[in-house]
């Protein structure tokens, strides 16, 4: 029975990791969507290339790249290097004493990048689904472009994007299992530890599956409530 307390703590770590990645990922998704929609094509192509790379790589590789790449970056900054611009050379060096990187932070960064790569396409599609007439109506009312976007376009865009973003949240929850490879004490790592200690792997992995299922069902309920609230103006009164 004592084994359930570490599992409950690890489940909290999993949900916390997913929520942090969701918050950062949504901000990055909006940034990527704007980046890919830039009017200057080279800038838009650069954004599309980054999103394509993130979507094309296996999720496990992205997690490992961020984790080991962070350590390598700290070593490079500590050793120092020179940026040669031709007419001027810029030395770059930082005094770094601690080269340990936070597995939790690396997990959040990796998962948020993965979430943003897919969510940005959902946001772009949702933005295109808003009728152009909304912009024209806002201009007729004398609103500025920013006011039109935030007061007229964005609320409608989020309603279109909610189903897709909700599905990607469920995928994000499952992707949190990948961070066990970089020693984040999430549900999967704790389950593996308990299974090894008790020599009952099947039993404890079934328990972990049940916990993931409960989290998913709760997420679906919350997403349904959010969707009902967001679309309440579109439903006819009974």
UniProtKB/Swiss-Prot annotation:
Stored Pfam families: BPD_transp_1
- Look up the record and report any one GO term of the cellular component aspect: membrane
Note the InterPro entries from the entry. AA_ABC_transptr_permease_3TM, ABC_transp_permease_HisMQ, MetI-like, MetI-like_sf
Q: Which domain of life is it from?
A: Bacteria
Which parts pass through the membrane?
15-35, 49-69, 99-119, 169-189, 202-222
What topology in the membrane does the UniProt record assign? Multi-pass membrane protein
Ligase among keywords: no
List the GO molecular function terms: transmembrane transporter activity
Question: Keywords of this protein's UniProt record, alphabetized?
Answer: Amino-acid transport, Cell inner membrane, Cell membrane, Membrane, Transmembrane, Transmembrane helix, Transport
PROSITE patterns referenced in this protein's UniProt entry, alphabetically: ABC_TM1
User: What family does the Swiss-Prot or TrEMBL record give for this protein?
Assistant: Belongs to the binding-protein-dependent transport system permease family. HisMQ subfamily.
Question: What is this protein's function?
Answer: Part of the ABC transporter complex ArtPIQMJ involved in arginine transport. Probably responsible for the translocation of the substrate across the membrane.
Summarize subunit and interaction data from the UniProt record for this chain: The complex is composed of two ATP-binding proteins (ArtP), two transmembrane proteins (ArtM and ArtQ) and two solute-binding proteins (ArtJ and ArtI).
Q: What is this protein called?
A: Arginine ABC transporter permease protein ArtQ
Which species is this record about? Escherichia coli (strain K12)
Q: What is the lineage of its organism?
A: Bacteria, Pseudomonadati, Pseudomonadota, Gammaproteobacteria, Enterobacterales
Q: Which gene codes for it?
A: artQ
């Amino acid at each position: 029975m004592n084994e359930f307390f570490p599992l409950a703590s690890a489940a909290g770590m999993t949900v916390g990791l997913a929520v942090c990645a969701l918050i950062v990922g949504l901000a990055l998704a909006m940034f990527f969507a704007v980046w890919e929609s830039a009017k200057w094509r080279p800038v838009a192509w650069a954004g599309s290339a980054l999103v394509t790379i993130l979507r094309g790589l296996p999720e496990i590789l992205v997690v490992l790249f961020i984790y080991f790449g962070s350590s390598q970056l700290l070593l490079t900054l500590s050793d120092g290097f020179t940026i040669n611009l031709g007419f001027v050379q810029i030395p770059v060096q930082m005094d770094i004493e601690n080269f340990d990187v936070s597995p939790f932070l690396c997990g959040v960064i990796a998962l948020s990048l993965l979430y943003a790569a897919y969510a940005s396409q959902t946001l772009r599609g949702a933005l295109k689904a808003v009728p152009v007439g909304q912009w024209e109506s806002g201009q007729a009312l004398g609103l500025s472009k920013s006011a039109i976007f935030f007061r007229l376009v964005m609320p409608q865009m989020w309603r279109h994007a909610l189903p897709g973003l909700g599905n990607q949240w469920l995928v994000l929850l499952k992707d949190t299992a990948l961070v066990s490879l970089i020693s984040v004490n999430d549900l999967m790592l704790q389950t593996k530890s308990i299974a090894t200690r008790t020599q009952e792997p099947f039993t404890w992995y079934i328990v972990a599956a049940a916990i993931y299922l409960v989290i998913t069902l709760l997420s679906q309920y919350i997403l349904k409530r959010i969707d009902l609230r967001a679309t309440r103006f579109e439903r006819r009164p009974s």
